[in-house]
Amino acid sequence: MFDYLIKNGQLIDGTGSPARRADVGITDGKIAAIGDLSAAQAGTVIDAAGKTVTPGFIDIHRHADAALFRPHFGELELKQGLTTIVNGNCGLSITPCSGPYRGEIKAYLTPVTGELSADADCSSMQAYLDAARRQPSPIHTAMLAGSGTIRACAAGFSAPTLDAAQLRTVQSLIERELAAGALGVSLGLGYAPDCFYSTETLIEALRPLQDSGIPITVHMRQEGSGVVGALREMIAVARALRTPVEISHLKSIGKANWRSCTPEMLRLMAEARQEGVRIACDVYPYTAGSTQLVHVLPPETQQGGMEALTEHLADPAFRETLKARMLTGSDFENISLLAGFENIVVSSVRLDGLRQYEGQSIAQIAEQQGKDPFTCLFDLLQAAHCDVTMIDFIAAEDDICDILRDAHSCVISDSTYPTTGMLHPRVYGTYTTLLEHFVREKQVLSLEAAVHKVTGRPAAVMGLRTKGVLAQGMDADINIFDPAQIHTRATYQDPAQFSDGLDTVFVSGQPAILHGALTGRKDGTVLTR
């Protein structure tokens, strides 16, 4: 006697194997049996005839560190089939946020994570995870230890180099956060203060992970004209530490780099794997990204934190030097040069007096104001104390297709959760966009391959041994849907719209969505290493 019996569905098990007709029995939150269960009995029987049954989807790259404490958290995730997410990415985890630099850390993270609830203690990974366990959730959540936050906790944003004591503090904090349950360590080498690491010091800072098998995820030092060199750096890190490295949201920014850098990077990773280096990548299925607007500036400008940068922007000489560097610089991720100000859209500004600019490009705002785009950009950042996010149109869909086809890639969203303004549509629509656009419309992947990239593959990357595959004894996180009915409603103009098509979603063996409707159940857990 099962608790639930899913009958007559086409089962895609998450391994990449072909779909097959099979029934699934669920008992006590686990998959109790798979096969011909036509003679079995259950408390509830769900007829999945004409539908596909898959593992629940797993997003190993979100920034919902603070959002999980908000009302209605998990609903938009469930509506696109997500049952597990991993936060703390890009080196920007919300923990450890303590000590003399706590205010600077919070100010830096807020455009990405949004405001943190007073109920959440983010002083350490242990305190944060304890708070998360007290917060009922409809989906499973896990954390990475953010290297940038750890370095900022140890030395702030002003130190371009670390002394021996500070380096030991960083290593100690990494060990502490991992011991508390972080699944791995994330790097944000395109952000302060991680961007101040040399390759050699970075390897030393990460020495606690050597030979551990614990994953390192990385937003590379740049994704523009120097992206291939940035990848070579991470191959060197993976080789030195002998632990897995996952390149986050692989892309090549700027038309000058499209269709050349991405194939080369895929080749370099394949060659490294042949040599025994454990390195792979993930990708989001959109040509636009989203992050802090300060990311268009050279990374050294973030030294000292956001208030220091705000003060510097009041200096005309600083602005002139900055403009000259941005007009020609190729030694950093020069988004304004590579993509153009017309492709940099202000998506959220926390200061009410500036929110009229949300949804407009820097080029459009500059034209309205009668300013050149650099002056417009600097004025906006200064007035908003740098608390601005952007949506930047930077990548090529053909490059995305190449990465999707790579056998070692998985799909992520890189969703940020600012508490004001416009979200990127990927927050609501990444997983249905993959199935609707790249599987059904473009046929870049088979349905089985796509499901593997959002279930079995990400589970393996993060060491989630009981998730990602439909097999006896695995956790009963399960999606049921008709692939022909999957549809993404979220757009750049109207991003906060639930996706269609997820008929039933099980979390921990209980229905979080039943017949297309959210049930309100909160059976998610906090996952730890």
Outline where the language-model segments fall.
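Active-site neighborhoods of metal-dependent hydrolases
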Residues: 128, 132, 137-164, 170-191, ...
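C-terminal cap of metal-dependent C-N hydrolases
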Residues: 9, 315, 402-408, 413-414, ...
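Histidine-rich, glycine-flanked metal-binding segment
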Residues: 1-56
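Short acidic, glycine/serine/threonine-rich loops at helix termini
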Residues: 95-102, 152-158, 199, 228-232, ...
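Divalent metal-coordination and catalytic microenvironments
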Residues: 9, 29, 50, 61, ...
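Divalent metal-binding pocket/active-site signature
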Residues: 168, 176-234
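Acidic, glycine-enriched loop/beta-strand segments at the rims
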Residues: 11-23, 388-394, 400, 442, ...
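Metal-associated gating/positioning segment near the N- to mid-region
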Residues: 40, 48-115, 119
